[in-house]
Structure formats: structure tokens, C-alpha cells
């Protein structure tokens, strides 16, 4: 069996679902069709992620796809399985949640379409990050997860949801340049050490030369990467307040008191 093709199919499922739902007119297409496409793609991602995880863990062999651009090893399979499981569970739960909001008039057909389109796109971007063997593509995938999440946060198009989406953008993109600079530092150092500089963008090509990298330069790259990923991952002291926190300033006393 060609497991590399299954890796491509795994990433393609949510992307195709997102593009398909985006192409459908929200006014004339019943909500049930969006729900069917949404759930079918997530079920496919769940099955393939668990199957590939079991294959990699039992065989002990990693799977490459599209040359060296995508790579699934034992560690990556854990994240892929988590994305598949959590994506399916949250996607299944959101069906009833969205239906309820439609019934009480909180969401319009176009907003329902927006939610399902960007939910699938978000799953796709997370899979790209977990499977990418290219350090630049991984950085692009991380930024893409932020952009797709913004439209999910602001799906209701209310004042509070749009404000929360704006806060999320500010918090998560404040360190975009730091993350890119840290990635470029890793590539630049690897290109100097490796005989073939074209291979310096692939994680699997970097690992054998890791002991030859400049320690100080790698520490600087780590700091820049931490500045970028800290707000997204919620790492202290870079973790932000929740994006839906109250927009009005608190009085000094409650703000200074412990939670």
C-alpha cells in the first residue's frame, strides 16, 4: 500500500471540503449539505489519521510524501491523531451548536457557510503544520492557522465577536517577523554547514548535522521562535488574556487582585 499517497489524501480531504463548501451558494443550498460535507471530511480525516498513526507506530518506519516536503514519523503521528480525534469531536458537537444558533436567529446562512468553510480550512492548516518537513512551509502553516481561526472567532459578525477576532489577530501576529527570522537563522546556519544548501530547509536533512550548528545562533533562533509561538501556545510569560475578555478597562483594584 502506498502510504505516502494516504498522507496526501489526509491533507486534501479538509482542503477539498473547504473549497467545495466555499463554492456553494449559501442562500439556495440547504444547511444539511454543508453539514454532510463537513462531517464526511472530518470522519475521513479521523480514519486516515488513526490508520497512519497505527502503521507508523507498529512498523517504526516514517512515511514521506511529495518527495521530502511532508514527513510522518512516530512523534508527528501523535499530533496527527490528536488533530483527527479532536477535529472530529468538536466538528460533530458543532452541528447541534450551529443548528441551535440558527434556530434562535443568531446565525444567518452565510455565517453558517463561513463557519464550516473555515473549520475545514483550520483542520487543513493544522495537518500541514504537523506533517510539513519544510521549515519555511511549517512557518507558513502556523500563520495560516491563525488566519483561518480569525474567521471562526468572528463568524457571528457581532461587535463582540469581531472585537475578539481583532484581539486574536493582534496577539498572534505580533511576533510573525520573529518567527520568520528564527526560521531563517536556522536555514542560514544549516546552509553553511551542509554540502547541499537546497536540503537545508528539510527537517530530516537537518537532524544529522545538528551537532555542527552554531550553538549561540540556535539559541537566538529558539528565542525568536518562542516569541512567535508563545502567544499562540499560551506559554508563560507570553500568554495573552482570552480574546473574548471584556473590552472595557477594569478598575485598578480588581485588576491587581489574584484570580
Which residues make up each language-model segment?
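Helix-loop junctions at the membrane-solvent interface of multi-pass transporters
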Residues: 23-24, 55, 97, 131-132, ...
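Juxtamembrane/interfacial segments at transmembrane-helix boundaries in multi-pass membrane proteins
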Residues: 56-69, 102-108, 178-251, 259
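Structural signature of hydrophobic alpha-helical transmembrane segments
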Residues: 2-14, 74-85, 135-148, 216-229
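Transmembrane helix-loop-helix hairpins at membrane boundaries of multipass inner-membrane proteins
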Residues: 1-9, 16-117, 197, 204, ...
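Short hydrophobic/aromatic segments of transmembrane alpha-helices and their interfaces
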Residues: 1-2, 12-13, 58-62, 118-121, ...
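Internal transmembrane alpha-helices of multipass membrane proteins
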Residues: 40-43, 65-67, 72-177, 248-253, ...
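Hydrophobic membrane-targeting signal helices
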Residues: 12, 16, 20, 47, ...
